[in-house]
Amino acid sequence: MGCNSYMPQGSAGGMLLLLLAFCLLGDAGCALSPPAASPALPTAHLPLSPRKGSNSSTAAGAPLATVPSATSPNKPRTQRALVVLVLVSAAVIIYFVIRTMRTRRKNKKTRKYGVLDTNLGNMELTPLEQDDEDDDTLFDANQSRR
């Protein structure tokens, strides 16, 4: 079996741990691999200042400042971190929804005594037959059919 063989099948906690381990190993793999040689980043040229003695603000041949474009080398890493964050958040939400649904289902099965769902106006309470004469009286709830 895989690395999650010690966890019960279908365990949301196990799935979260497996996802976390995958993310950590994925980041370590990227950190260990040498960075690939990327082509020179495209740059946008903006005028630094107008030439002395020139009336126009954008003179041809003016010294230009280079500004890196919107694409940065950290964009894939940031995008990957965002995807991991969204996936982990979705897994946590799904875990809590499933856990809530399971506890509600168990409560319906195990609840023997509680508030009756029927209208109390239609109930007829009669004492149960007992040999003891105690202060506690138990009543049998029967719906009267009128």
Curated annotation (Swiss-Prot):
It is a single-pass type I membrane protein. Its main location: membrane. The chain crosses the membrane at residues 81-101. Residues 129-138 have a biased composition (Acidic residues). InterPro entries: FAM174-like (IPR009565). Residues 102-146 are cytoplasmic. Residues 1-30 form the signal peptide. Glycans are attached at N55. The keyword Amino-acid biosynthesis does not apply. It comes from the Eukaryota. Keywords: Glycoprotein, Membrane, Signal, Transmembrane, Transmembrane helix. It is found in: Membrane. Residues 43-75, 125-146 are annotated as: Disordered. One of its GO terms (cellular component) is membrane. The keyword Glycoprotein applies. It holds the Pfam family DUF1180. Residues 31-80 are extracellular. Belongs to the FAM174 family. This is Membrane protein FAM174. It comes from Xenopus tropicalis.
